[in-house]
Amino acid sequence: MKRALTLFSFGAMMAFASAQVLANGNIENGKQKAATCFACHGADGNSVDPQYPRLAGQYNAYLVQVLHEYKDGQRNNAIMKGMDATLSDQDIEDIAAYFSSLPTKLDTLKGHVQGD
């Protein structure tokens, strides 16, 4: 019984923490702000081109971190640097909330992209 109560408490705590991560961004605002992302990453966040990562279903915190890294120059990509330059912290939170709320497609991407 103690074990079940402990597991239930842990599960409830994790659900609350997950909701808090999503609470920082507004999904509807993110959808509008992400319109420029659709050309490369797809309108549903599931890019069909293997050189652009799928954003749908990614962890919210990961997307926020990556967008900040592009904006701050910690990640070097000319396209993303230009796309990210004018985003505010709230824009980043909203865009991350939008893409993380979308279902991902688990089919195999066609083609192969060479790494650096």
What are these regions (language model features)?
Residues 66, 70, 83-86:
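Amphipathic alpha-helical segments that mediate coupling or scaffolding at interfaces
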Residues 24-34, 43, 75-116:
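Flexible coil segments in periplasmic/lumen-exposed cytochrome c-class electron-transfer proteins
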Residues 10-14:
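Hydrophobic alpha-helical targeting segments used for export or membrane insertion
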Residues 1-9:
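Bacterial N-terminal signal peptides that target proteins for export
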Residues 8, 47, 62, 87-90:
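A broad, structure-centric signal for solvent-exposed, well-ordered loop/edge residues
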Residues 16-18:
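N-terminal signal peptide c-region/cleavage motif recognized by signal peptidases
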Residues 31-69:
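N-terminal targeting signals for Sec/Tat export/insertion, comprising classic cleavable signal peptides
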